[in-house]
């Protein structure tokens, strides 16, 4: 793995992408989300600080004045979430002036069983708090086994799920 957080630009969406910028180097990260809020750029990313490629447990916050900055500043309280049942990013959206972070919910022996939608209550370069407003579980009556991503940007809604099919 490259151990980088990379920003790509679509040259022919969704088929062709070009590397625009390496935002962070020498970091074991996954499921990074970058967004602008109150004239600052924020990065929420899952970092494995134990060097075991476990991206479930730690959510880290960084901020910068410019998206293309070479200086993403870590929040003093990093990791802002240290909890394997809550930390893993699973999507992001803004609605009615509110910001929402979606997290994966892991189940025993089941990666990405469900997701939770969390309203971000406070986000500054050194403060972060969120509260869970909804938990979304797979609809087992339809055969859905897992669902662990939801993202909405005003034009597109993206989510994933898996089904169990009888043989």
Give the positions of each predicted feature:
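Carbohydrate-active catalytic/glycan-binding domains of CAZyme proteins
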Residues: 1-167
């Amino acid at each position: 793995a490259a151990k980088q957080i990379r920003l790509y630009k679509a040259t022919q969406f969704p088929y062709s992408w070009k590397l625009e910028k390496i935002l962070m180097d020498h970091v074991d990260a996954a499921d990074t989300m970058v967004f602008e809020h109150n004239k600052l750029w924020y990065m929420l990313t899952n970092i494995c600080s134990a060097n075991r490629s476990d991206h479930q447990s730690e959510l880290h916050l960084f901020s910068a004045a410019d998206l293309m900055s070479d200086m993403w500043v870590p929040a003093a309280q990093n990791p802002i979430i240290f909890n394997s049942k809550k930390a893993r990013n699973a999507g992001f959206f803004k609605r009615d002036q509110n910001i929402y972070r979606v997290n994966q919910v892991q189940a025993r022996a089941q990666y990405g069983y469900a997701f939770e939608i969390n309203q971000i209550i406070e986000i500054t370069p050194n403060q972060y708090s969120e509260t869970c407003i909804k938990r979304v579980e797979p609809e087992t009556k339809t055969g859905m086994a897992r669902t662990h991503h939801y993202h909405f940007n005003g034009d597109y809604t993206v989510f994933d799920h898996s089904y169990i099919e009888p043989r």
